[in-house]
Amino acid sequence: MVGQQYSSAPLRTVKEVQFGLFSPEEVRAISVAKIRFPETMDETQTRAKIGGLNDPRLGSIDRNLKCQTCQEGMNECPGHFGHIDLAKPVFHVGFIAKIKKVCECVCMHCGKLLLDEHNELMRQALAIKDSKKRFAAIWTLCKTKMVCETDVPSEDDPTQLVSRGGCGNTQPTIRKDGLKLVGSWKKDRATGDADEPELRVLSTEEILNIFKHISVKDFTSLGFNEVFSRPEWMILTCLPVPPPPVRPSISFNESQRGEDDLTFKLADILKANISLETLEHNGAPHHAIEEAESLLQFHVATYMDNDIAGQPQALQKSGRPVKSIRARLKGKEGRIRGNLMGKRVDFSARTVISGDPNLELDQVGVPKSIAKTLTYPEVVTPYNIDRLTQLVRNGPNEHPGAKYVIRDSGDRIDLRYSKRAGDIQLQYGWKVERHIMDNDPVLFNRQPSLHKMSMMAHRVKVIPYSTFRLNLSVTSPYNADFDGDEMNLHVPQSEETRAELSQLCAVPLQIVSPQSNKPCMGIVQDTLCGIRKLTLRDTFIELDQVLNMLYWVPDWDGVIPTPAIIKPKPLWSGKQILSVAIPNGIHLQRFDEGTTLLSPKDNGMLIIDGQIIFGVVEKKTVGSSNGGLIHVVTREKGPQVCAKLFGNIQKVVNFWLLHNGFSTGIGDTIADGPTMREITETIAEAKKKVLDVTKEAQANLLTAKHGMTLRESFEDNVVRFLNEARDKAGRLAEVNLKDLNNVKQMVMAGSKGSFINIAQMSACVGQQSVEGKRIAFGFVDRTLPHFSKDDYSPESKGFVENSYLRGLTPQEFFFHAMGGREGLIDTAVKTAETGYIQRRLVKALEDIMVHYDNTTRNSLGNVIQFIYGEDGMDAAHIEKQSLDTIGGSDAAFEKRYRVDLLNTDHTLDPSLLESGSEILGDLKLQVLLDEEYKQLVKDRKFLREVFVDGEANWPLPVNIRRIIQNAQQTFHIDHTKPSDLTIKDIVLGVKDLQENLLVLRGKNEIIQNAQRDAVTLFCCLLRSRLATRRVLQEYRLTKQAFDWVLSNIEAQFLRSVVHPGEMVGVLAAQSIGEPATQMTLNTFHFAGVASKKVTSGVPRLKEILNVAKNMKTPSLTVYLEPGHAADQEQAKLIRSAIEHTTLKSVTIASEIYYDPDPRSTVIPEDEEIIQLHFSLLDEEAEQSFDQQSPWLLRLELDRAAMNDKDLTMGQVGERIKQTFKNDLFVIWSEDNDEKLIIRCRVVRPKSLDAETEAEEDHMLKKIENTMLENITLRGVENIERVVMMKYDRKVPSPTGEYVKEPEWVLETDGVNLSEVMTVPGIDPTRIYTNSFIDIMEVLGIEAGRAALYKEVYNVIASDGSYVNYRHMALLVDVMTTQGGLTSVTRHGFNRSNTGALMRCSFEETVEILFEAGASAELDDCRGVSENVILGQMAPIGTGAFDVMIDEESLVKYMPEQKITEIEDGQDGGVTPYSNESGLVNADLDVKDELMFSPLVDSGSNDAMAGGFTAYGGADYGEATSPFGAYGEAPTSPGFGVSSPGFSPTSPTYSPTSPAYSPTSPSYSPTSPSYSPTSPSYSPTSPSYSPTSPSYSPTSPSYSPTSPSYSPTSPSYSPTSPSYSPTSPSYSPTSPSYSPTSPSYSPTSPSYSPTSPSYSPTSPAYSPTSPSYSPTSPSYSPTSPSYSPTSPSYSPTSPNYSPTSPSYSPTSPGYSPGSPAYSPKQDEQKHNENENSR
């Protein structure tokens, strides 16, 4: 550390962490001082004592003293270790258990393993690779081995013995007793007293000695390591002493110091050690030494771990337990989680938030005081030096200013104190720490950060006052409100971080959330309320207000729409004005129930080309809904436009609402008189019903529903009546409130409130419930002392019949408070529960990432999914779409899809096609069409197998319907004209498209299968939407439109593929954890509905994640075999066959009598039974009379239960007989007797003595018990109760459409899957249980995975949330990927073999680190946690790849360029269309068209329309053209703002500009200087213009007037295949489409991203081009000296040297026009002449 110089070079990163144990030698080698004294200070109490605990060699913690070892001050010296030599070895407390296990594995005399390869099981154990598992296996085998064998039987011949080198001694059984190990030896029988084993404490020396004798081979088998962790190192002989900086003392004044707990503990250890040494030295008695030794052991143990079970805690003088080393590391506040995984950070701010509707969606208002405090270090460059100088002049107190200047030497100048701040001359490369300013990207966050939308990047807007301001719509993802919430802001400190924030985290990019593939932001609050009022049919606005409103639209084009009403005065409808804020080209339609095209209620929604046609805009349209306006705009126009849309809508609507007004008050809750009367009647009626039911129940006339007790049935009825009354009253109130009612307006707009709020405010608050039941009796038999006992009336049990408006009575208020209190407690409990669940999920999935081979893997590289989500799509790019082929009848299907050119029924109407009449009867075409139709039928069959119930709404990429709509709009499809498409175009186009939809690229089988699976569903959708008949008949697309649709689908599909580096694990964990937080803890939705009770909500989620063996409510769902599903009788039969019925469940009473005479009875009721029975006696029974016992067991059965279970007395009696065979004599009454009685007597064997007879009644009691508990009368074990439920199942009818069929389903309590599956009459293929553990055990891991998924899905769906499939699938894949069920707990995923650092950051921190040390683990630091701990960039996201640098090429091609040259180059390369472009020499009088030839108007030549559109080239970029979108433009692939090389000035440099078709013979990349990046492309060369390689104004052969170069010359004719850039039909807006060049039709095979001639990185590369040779060393499109054909211009040629004077772009010898420079010129002229012919 001495004199270290400042360096800006980055430090090396940690590649791996090796764990191990310290050996005593190593401790001594590290140590700088031997510590001998427990004192810290010397006698003077001023200096640290030499050899004491604060020895000056250990490091200084006094800022006045230097460290004696490294001579550094307190700030620089990290501290140095010392050591204590212990008088006796002691156990390391963390390893006592392991030491015990090792002792049990090796011989306690010779140190040899007790078993070796001679033992078969041991051989298997030794073969285990994982050292921890191997150790566990060996220990299991060895711990029972009680002798160290000298020889063992040989394998070949068991009679012969083979020596194994053991010592033959017996082994002790070892017990852990506190901190000691106690051995007990069983003595040999030979030596006598076998009863008394020898007991003694195993001393540490003894164990240390044995461990030293274990051979390397043996301890390696036990999982230790020769170099890093030998077993003897688990026993401490030399203790390292941490340096004082780790245990600093605090000084109160000169003399008094307070020492740290560790120092205190170390002093104890030293004292104990010294006293032990003294005792040994003085030869003290054995027990004294033993005592001193155990004291030392205690101190060393509590120094490391002060929470040892069964050990007293070491206390401070104050009585507070000492904080041990272990306590410093573990837990949330500990070192790992508290200081390494998460730390407090600089450059952050926190304050209260408030709303501001005038900010843009992605802005954040930052108070000026914060903006002046937070800084960003900006590097001084030529471009910003003036600005930064001004900031430095402004200084730290004026915004915008700067706080520090950092020189390139690393020195900081603090501008607060700098005298000469004004005249600091900034130098390039210095840094200025400037204040944050407008539009800086910052990270904004609100805790708890439950999902990735809780941290987003905003743009700064510096504003006055002291709170953060944010747009209202961005509050929902943060879950923020303005009632005092605070939020945090973090300022990025490097350009890379800024780039990541603005390109990855920016708010607009998060609008559509991957959690449920829908937007997570929408219009909220007053804007939402106002937007509904604004778009009502009767909202009209006058001219003055319209003008004001239009001014509020930020990008209004200045055109006032035509008013909707002209006379008597012009009026504009609200819909019109709102439409101005919606971008053009947006289509949206939604039909609510009962919407026609002109719905009287104005419900539904239709937006065409950004104009609202009908429908009131409310939450369904502009809320965060799937397929709403926000979603569509993001998908169609890109995130930036969508973010703008939020602002536009808010500004317009808020302005209107401000002037229109909206307020709500108590009057809005009042319903009119007649309604109130009706409400009162409704409630009275319900109370009367309840009274009737109560009377019925008291008179015992109520029948219990199946599976419920009588009381449950009664409660169920009461609650049902009361809830119905409340809902009915609420509906009355709601219907009565007018549409003008303000509360109702808020509910209808969706901005606040719901139906239930109206009902409770105006009508009736309703039944209060606690734990899902009515209020229970808390006092004796009553709820409150104000009621009489046993009062079950609604008032007494918590029914509140008043509304909030009328006010509650005291009793009602009390019950209401009870219900409310429960809600609060529930919320508090839930927050803790779900927080822990979320943490476990995140830690279990944190390292799962999509890799560059599209697999989803964890940090070990284990494959979790071969392709993410099984389709490789990014969840944010997916939308719910319906697969059309699945529904409808067969006839309708055929009508919609079948085309038969040979048959008049299914032929196409000839008027649809221009070639309509020619194709009828065309057999070749018919073959294509039949193939298409067969495939569609196959799809239909396949989809019906997958989506059994015919519901085929599934989230898929690329909204095809919208692309078709856009095409119809863009190409002005006329539904009356025939199309110029041919059937072949359609069928083959769709076929080619399917082949181009590549998610995975590769030839091997696994990849091919995964690729096929990934696109299967999407291809089904594609084929159904683009079937020939639909394209021609429904959509009426033209050839141009159809091609556009295809290329668009492909581009959007490829854009939807998930990006490698995406951390999908955390995404999945958050997507499941976040809805869990919104879940109610215990869901009582099914309060007493007659069905099985199912755990749901958070408790069920906990069960699933813990893989709980005993669930609260295990249950089976049993379906009947096909054919009998609707048969109720059959269902009853099966119910009784599987419901488990014990004798106990049908018995009312059981009694024991002394009834000595078997032939008669003392019980009068039973005489009939006996007489009846004895009239039918057989011989055997006669004989048994004498042996029958006088004690009688008499059972009375329950007739109702017997009937319910469908049992007869005979069956029960025979079952008892069967169980006890001849030991019991049983008789029973008839089935129709008054009472059902069974009488049993024990039959005694003849040889019974009197003594036994006396105990017979006891024996009978035991028999009675056995009978009632164990006798199963019928059914399957564990199936406690079976409920029959009737469900409707959707099945395809014979005609093909889906119809509902009722079926009976049995729901059970209890599970016994394997048994129930064998019961005849059920459908074993459909049986299901919610216990996925059983499913896995019976049906295997794949079935288990499916069941686990279904359970997770049900928990989340039960709450009404929706989470995309891939997140839950990833979770269940992780849980099942090991082949068993891995729970999301410390016993599950945290036992896997991921890195120790990663595991210790979850739970059991210290134990995991001990284990890692003992087994010498190596952590390769590929996980997230490891890199967070080490403070490194983790290999995820933008850090997931490496960059390879070709160093040779670097040296070769580094041009020496001045800064100005770079500037000019940039200017030209990226600035299209500008005369001032740096690449033009102003002296040249060249026409614009010639300069940038491709810019000729595309629409001019209609017959040859080159653009996709009829718009001229000048329209490029306007909103009307389909190419005007942002980076997400759904147009040609790669064309958009973000496309790197597209610039009209560099046609050869654009992957999307095919007009330079390399296949055209006259084009050859011979122009040495045609590349914007080439240095020779410089304005300093006057003789060069990009249109011709050999252009020189002085050359007579090239002048616009010369006949050989005239746009009309045949060589440039637009129809010629040479397709020159000057040809009028080439337009930059038609990047991939040119009707005349056969080689460039997007559907032609040569235009395919995979075809070799198309590669975006090498625009001029084409194997067919004659002048291209792959062997040319200098060919590289980016190389500054790129020209494959010129031999004299090859960087490898000997005379090439950038520094040589002959190579200078300005030298006259270097002129592209000079003949000497173009060796290929003649050849080229020759080519041109050839072409012109």
Swiss-Prot record:
Binding site for Mg(2+) 2: 481, 483
Complex and partners: Component of the RNA polymerase II (Pol II) complex consisting of 12 subunits. Interacts with DEF1; the interaction is direct and serves to bridge RPB1 to the Elongin complex in a DNA-damaged dependent manner. Interacts with the Elongin subunit ELA1. Interacts with the Elongin subunit ELC1. Interacts with ASK10. Interacts with ESS1. Interacts with RTT103. Interacts with SHE2.
Binding positions for Mg(2+) 1 per the UniProt entry: 481, 483, 485
Residue numbers bearing the Phosphothreonine modification: 1471
Low complexity composition bias: residue spans: 1538-1719
UniProt name for this protein: DNA-directed RNA polymerase II subunit RPB1
Chain residue ranges for the region called Bridging helix: 810-822
Chain spans, region Rudder loop: 306-323
Residue ranges, annotated region (C-terminal domain (CTD)): 1549-1716
Region (Lid loop): 248-260
SUPFAM superfamilies, A to Z: beta and beta-prime subunits of DNA dependent RNA-polymerase
Region described as Disordered: spans on this chain: 1537-1733
Gene Ontology cellular component annotations, sorted alphabetically: cytoplasmic stress granule; mitochondrion; nucleus; RNA polymerase II, core complex
